[in-house]
């Protein structure tokens, strides 16, 4: 699973997922399913905000990356992917500026057009079940919830899907592709079922033991783009690189 994640997701997303797991004391070598889930959630959050801006009239517009309109305001503020301290700093700043009610839990995005925080969910289960779990946890009508599944289903607060149909279709297509690629590598069942995940982990550990005697040369290269952008990747151009380089899963 770890190899699959590194092949199929943008290196910057992988880096952010690694940092998130390290912050919470989780080992990605063991919790590979969580590693994949975090990367998937991050990518959906970035895709959700992709190309969406607010013009001078306060209207939401879609602008392609090649468009020279750099002065347009991003419609969405990305909160997910930041360390907790910085994330809460951003949330507090938004609340002070807009008058929005401070959420109890860290949300994923803020929508400047609708003036609301958004919680994004990506589930391997039924969307309505996951939606209810999110709603029960958040317990706030102020935070908008939008759930996507790997089967193309979605559910949102008051059936308000925020984005246009084409933007949502991009997200659904990407999730379906991830599912298909996992399935082609025999990883999907373990990703969905914790019991299957434990079996897969035992197989992986056994395989590692068998290979322990052989020397392996591992590349530890750091992406030049990541060196340049970090820690500035969340500035006004924070998603430019990500927009241009979402990686497709290579063929098996």
From Swiss-Prot:
- Mind telling me which residues the site (Important for efficient shutoff activity and nuclear localization) is annotated on? 195, 198-199
**InterPro entries found in the cross-reference section:** PA/PA-X, PA/PA-X_sf
A molecular function GO annotation: RNA binding
Record's subcellular location: Host cytoplasm; Host nucleus
A Pfam family it matches: Flu_PA
Q: Enumerate the UniProt keywords alphabetically.
A: Decay of host mRNAs by virus, Eukaryotic host gene expression shutoff by virus, Host cytoplasm, Host gene expression shutoff by virus, Host mRNA suppression by virus, Host nucleus, Host-virus interaction
The catalytic residues are 80, 108
**One record GO biological process:** viral translational frameshifting
Q: Where is this site: Important for efficient shutoff activity?
A: 202-203, 206
Transmembrane portions of the chain: none
Q: Which branch of life, at top level?
A: Viruses
Q: What is its main location?
A: host cell
**Family of this protein:** Belongs to the influenza viruses PA-X family.
Its biological purpose: Plays a major role in the shutoff of the host protein expression by cleaving mRNAs probably via an endonuclease activity. This host shutoff allows the virus to escape from the host antiviral response. Hijacks host RNA splicing machinery to selectively target host RNAs containing introns for destruction. This may explain the preferential degradation of RNAs that have undergone co- or post-transcriptional processing.
Q: What free text does the record give on domains?
A: The probable endonuclease active site in the N-terminus and the basic amino acid cluster in the C-terminus are important for the shutoff activity. The C-terminus acts as a nuclear localization signal. The C-terminus is recruited to host protein complexes involved in nuclear Pol II RNA processing.
What is the protein name for this chain? Protein PA-X
Q: Which organism is it from?
A: Influenza A virus (strain A/Chile/1/1983 H1N1)
């Amino acid at each position: 699973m770890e190899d699959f994640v590194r092949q199929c997701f943008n290196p910057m997303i992988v880096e952010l997922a690694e940092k998130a797991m390290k912050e919470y004391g989780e080992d990605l070598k063991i919790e590979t399913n969580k590693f994949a889930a975090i990367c998937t959630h991050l990518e959906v959050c970035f895709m959700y905000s992709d190309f969406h801006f607010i013009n001078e009239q306060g209207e939401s517009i879609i602008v392609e990356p090649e468009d020279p309109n750099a002065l347009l305001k991003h419609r969405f503020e990305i909160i997910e992917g930041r360390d907790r301290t910085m994330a809460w700093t951003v949330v507090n700043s938004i609340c002070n500026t807009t008058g929005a009610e401070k959420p109890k839990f860290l949300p994923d995005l803020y929508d400047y057009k609708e003036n609301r925080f958004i919680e994004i969910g990506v589930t391997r289960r039924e969307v309505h079940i996951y939606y209810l779990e999110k709603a029960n946890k958040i317990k706030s009508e102020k935070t908008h919830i939008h759930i996507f599944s790997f089967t193309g289903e979605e559910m949102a607060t008051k059936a308000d899907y925020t984005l246009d149909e084409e933007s949502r279709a991009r997200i659904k297509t990407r999730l379906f592709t991830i599912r298909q690629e996992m399935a082609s590598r025999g990883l999907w069942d373990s990703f969905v079922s914790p019991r299957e995940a434990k079996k897969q982990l035992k197989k992986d550990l056994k395989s590692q033991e068998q290979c322990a005697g052989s020397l392996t040369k591992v590349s530890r290269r750091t992406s030049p783009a990541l060196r340049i952008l970090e820690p500035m990747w969340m500035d006004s151009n924070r998603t430019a690189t990500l927009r241009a380089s979402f990686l497709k899963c290579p063929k098996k």
